[in-house]
Amino acid sequence: MNSKIKFYQSIHFKIALVFALMLMLTLEVVGAVFVRQLEHQELANFKQQIELPSYIDNSLATQLTSTDTKTANKEIKTILARVNNTSITEIWVVDAKGIIRGTSSSGNQGIVGQKTTDTVIKNTLVNNRSHTENLYDSANHNRYYVSVVPLLASGNANNVVGVVYMRANLEGVYSTINSISLIYLSAALITIVLGLGLAVLISREIIRESKTPVVVLTT
């Protein structure tokens, strides 16, 4: 006596499963490329949004060449206070000797006048090359974008008078990326479920047609 074949053992389910796996693989590859491109684009837009205008860099460089350090530091503080960008966590202005001449953080003014120990800042002062990197702060579990840009004396591209150190919070960017990725994942799961159901229906029709006897007419 033939036992009844369970649905998951039937040819209908196997055909549908193969179709669903192929669809899942395709969506996974497309999703990986999509998320990577999205991250690249969002980060590029973010970096462009927080980039300081050239006139601010020029103003800071001018103050660093001033012999009146006290007045220059006040001007630097005023210039940094005009930078209105909530994504920027903090900006430092460091002179050619490695002395911190200003910070945008009102609660961190105590570092002004101190010599920086940051290796990246020191290297930028020496090699005259900008440096950018993404960092993860294990203390607060936040990701940051760090940019160190040399400040050049007016009319002399080889004379580094200081650097601008900028630190910006990336959590908003990755929150947007995660939200969009979640929407894509939800849509992909719905597509797979619908595809699985459609594949079952199609496989049933194909098998039903294959079992239909063919009548051969003879004359």
Residues of each region from the PLM?
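Juxtamembrane segments flanking the first transmembrane helix
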Residues: N2-I99, S105-N108
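Glycine-rich acetyl-CoA-binding "A-motif" of GNAT/NAT acetyltransferases
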Residues: V160
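Short glycine-/small-residue motifs
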Residues: T103, V163
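Membrane-proximal alpha-helical signal-transduction linkers
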Residues: E205-T219
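Helix-start (N-cap) segments at beta->loop->alpha junctions
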Residues: L151-G155, Y165-Y184
